[in-house]
């Protein structure tokens, strides 16, 4: 019974291994179908089947048949796979719709390039506007009291009328009268005054009372001996200014008055190499009055002003200075002036644009409605016509320089200093104020931010267009690839069905052969088991015999051991008695 159970267990184990191998081959085939690797599937499956179902018996003819069938299937599948790959490559390498490289609407430009393009587009607008040439108007359409202006234009009354013009003149007269009545207490601000925290930084050692020059008092003055080798004074101004005017005075009698002096400025002190910026050398009059000296080229924003006395009138002992005043333009003043100029230029440009934007057709229609009293219009003799028409123009005539100011500003934004042919030095342009630099930076940031927003919008539009084109192209490619994939999959499925049928037949044959081999194997093992049973019974008998012999031997040993112990005890007792006798004898 035990032998039969063992045999049935072996058969069940072999069948489980075979089914597991078949399932593994099927899963491998299903996993590799999508990758078009059918050749690997066929070879792997045949080898796996042959490895799993290999038997001790030789099946050489069957294996050669399997390899031939597999090689034929591999060749056909390789041809189909090559055709599919060629189709896929043709689909992937299809040329996209060509783009015009010069078209900026379809190309991605950098921010700087895009900014240049936009600036050209904006600048082309006024150029087109300025390039228009007006046709001459026929003077026969003028009335009797109308005359021709400097630009061959007449007053049509669309900007001003008589009432408005008279009101404007009256307002201007009233304003001028009020301005004359007003009392002005102080026209300029003295930046070298002690009231606005101006101080004396340095003077020559012989000078006494240098701070008195900052106070408007005739009783206090800077006292300096005329024999001093260097006579100078350094004043720290209230603010950083462009020095435009200096007033200096000596009210003291019986003293020498300064004759020539040098004015220098600086933006910091102490200086590294005493690099003062010289504004000029001036010559004063020999008088006891406040003398003014204009600075035509301020050059830098000055925080410190230095006055050096070079020569004097007369030969008195003391050469005093009673008062020093410094006038100029601060950074905030210059900023406000620039703002006002920009606003005036803007208003003037708006006015000129309004005049230039008049429609010629409207003027011609207006002229047609005007009654003409000239019998024979003579366009060539304009001087006689102007003399006959004695009237005054209602519009204020625009000067030639003012008319072309906007046009010149568009073509010449930066004024360049033209060097004269004489040997005089070129005046240095004053540096810009911090407020002007800040406003320039802010305006640049504002323009850049607005341009950045528009740039991002345009780039997003370009991206959306390009994404749409890419989506359409990928849709076409994907549909083409899907058709090719379906064709290849159907062909591969047909080949796999054929291969599965062949594999099924081969596996059935192999299983039948394996069954026969298993039967032979079980019979052989049954014979071996019978022999083992006989040997086990014989060994059992030998074990029983050896066991009984061992038990007898142990019993014999135990019996003989008891006699030995008794003899040993007797000899031991005799030895002890002999030892006692010997000890007693010794004593």
From Swiss-Prot:
Segments in the Lumenal topological domain: 22-541
In this protein, the residues bearing a glycan are 25, 378, 381, 408, 448, 486
Q: Where is this region: Disordered?
A: 44-108
- Specify the protein's topology with respect to the membrane: Single-pass type I membrane protein
Query: Principal place where this protein is found?
Result: endoplasmic reticulum
Q: Which residues lie on this side of the membrane: Cytoplasmic?
A: 563-587
Leader peptide range in chain numbering: 1-21
- Residues in domain SUN? 163-331
What Gene Ontology terms for biological process does this UniProt record contain?
protein folding in endoplasmic reticulum
Q: Show the ranges annotated as biased composition (Polar residues).
A: 91-108
**TM spans, by residue?**
542-562
Q: Which Pfam families match?
A: Sad1_UNC
Please provide the record's keywords in A-Z order: Endoplasmic reticulum, Glycoprotein, Membrane, Signal, Transmembrane, Transmembrane helix
Where in or outside the cell it occurs: the entry states: Endoplasmic reticulum membrane
Superkingdom: Eukaryota
Compositional bias (Basic and acidic residues) = 63-90
A GO CC term assigned to this protein in UniProt? cytoplasm
Q: What else is known?
A: Present with 3250 molecules/cell in log phase SD medium.
Family classification: Belongs to the SLP1 family.
Query: Per its UniProt record, what PANTHER family does this chain match?
Result: MEMBRANE PROTEIN CH1 RELATED (PTHR12953), SUN DOMAIN-CONTAINING OSSIFICATION FACTOR (PTHR12953:SF0)
Its biological purpose: May be involved in membrane protein folding. Required for localization of MPS3 to the nuclear envelope.
Its quaternary organisation is: Interacts with EMP65.
Q: What is this protein called?
A: Uncharacterized protein SLP1
Q: What is the lineage of its organism?
A: Eukaryota, Fungi, Dikarya, Ascomycota, Saccharomycotina
């Amino acid at each position: 019974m035990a032998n039969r159970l063992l045999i049935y267990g072996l058969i069940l184990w072999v069948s489980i291994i075979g089914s597991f191998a078949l399932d593994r081959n099927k899963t491998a085939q299903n996993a590799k179908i999508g990758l078009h690797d059918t050749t690997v599937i066929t070879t792997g499956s045949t080898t796996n089947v042959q490895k799993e179902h290999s038997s001790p018996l030789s099946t050489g003819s069957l294996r050669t048949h399997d390899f031939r069938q597999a090689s034929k299937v591999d060749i056909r599948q390789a041809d189909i796979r090559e055709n599919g790959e060629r189709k896929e490559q043709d689909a992937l390498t299809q040329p996209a719709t060509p783009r015009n490289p010069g078209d900026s609407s379809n190309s991605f430009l950098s921010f700087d390039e895009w900014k240049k393009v936009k600036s050209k587009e904006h600048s082309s607008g006024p150029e087109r506007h300025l390039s228009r040439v007006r046709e001459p108007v026929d003077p026969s359409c003028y009335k009797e009291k109308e005359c021709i202006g400097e630009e061959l234009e007449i007053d049509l009354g669309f900007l001003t009328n008589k009432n408005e013009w008279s009101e404007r003149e009256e307002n201007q007269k009233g304003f001028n009268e009020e301005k004359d009545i007003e009392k002005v207490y102080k026209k300029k601000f003295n930046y070298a005054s002690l009231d606005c925290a101006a101080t004396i930084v340095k003077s020559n050692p012989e000078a006494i009372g240098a701070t008195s020059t900052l106070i408007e008092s005739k009783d206090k003055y800077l006292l300096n001996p005329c024999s001093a080798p260097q006579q100078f004074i350094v004043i720290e101004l209230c603010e950083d200014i462009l020095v435009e005017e200096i007033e200096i005075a000596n009210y003291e009698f019986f003293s020498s008055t300064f004759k020539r002096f040098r004015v220098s400025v600086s933006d910091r002190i102490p200086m590294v190499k005493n690099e003062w910026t010289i504004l000029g050398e001036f010559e004063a009059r020999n008088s006891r009055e406040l003398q003014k000296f204009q600075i035509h080229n301020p050059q830098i924003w000055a925080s410190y002003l230095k006055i050096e006395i070079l020569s004097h009138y007369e030969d008195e002992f003391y050469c005093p200075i009673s008062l020093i005043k410094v006038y100029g333009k601060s950074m905030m003043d210059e900023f406000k002036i620039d703002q006002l100029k920009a606003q005036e230029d803007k208003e003037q440009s708006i006015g000129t644009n309004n005049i230039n934007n008049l429609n010629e057709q409207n003027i011609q229609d207006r002229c047609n409605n005007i009654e003409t009293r000239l019998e024979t219009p003579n366009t060539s003799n304009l001087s006689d016509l102007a003399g006959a028409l004695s009237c005054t123009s209602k519009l204020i005539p625009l000067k030639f320089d003012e008319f072309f100011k906007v046009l010149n500003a568009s073509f010449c934004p930066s004024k360049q200093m033209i060097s004269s042919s004489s040997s005089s030095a070129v005046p240095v342009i004053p540096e810009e104020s911090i407020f002007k630099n800040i406003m320039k930076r802010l305006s640049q940031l504002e323009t850049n931010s607005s341009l950045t927003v528009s740039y991002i919008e345009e780039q997003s539009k370009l991206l959306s267009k390009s994404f749409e084109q890419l989506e359409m192209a990928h849709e076409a490619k994907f549909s083409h690839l899907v058709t090719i994939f379906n064709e290849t999959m159907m062909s591969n499925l047909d080949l796999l069905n054929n291969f599965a049928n062949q594999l099924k037949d081969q596996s059935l044959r192999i299983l039948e052969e394996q069954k026969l081999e298993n039967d032979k194997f079980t019979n052989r093992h049954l014979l071996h088991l019978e022999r083992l049973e006989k040997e086990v019974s014989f060994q059992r008998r030998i074990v029983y015999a050896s066991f009984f012999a061992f038990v007898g031997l142990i019993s014999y040993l135990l019996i003989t051991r008891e006699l030995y112990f008794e003899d040993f005890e007797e000899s031991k007792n005799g030895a002890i008695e002999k030892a006692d006798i010997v000890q007693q004898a010794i004593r």
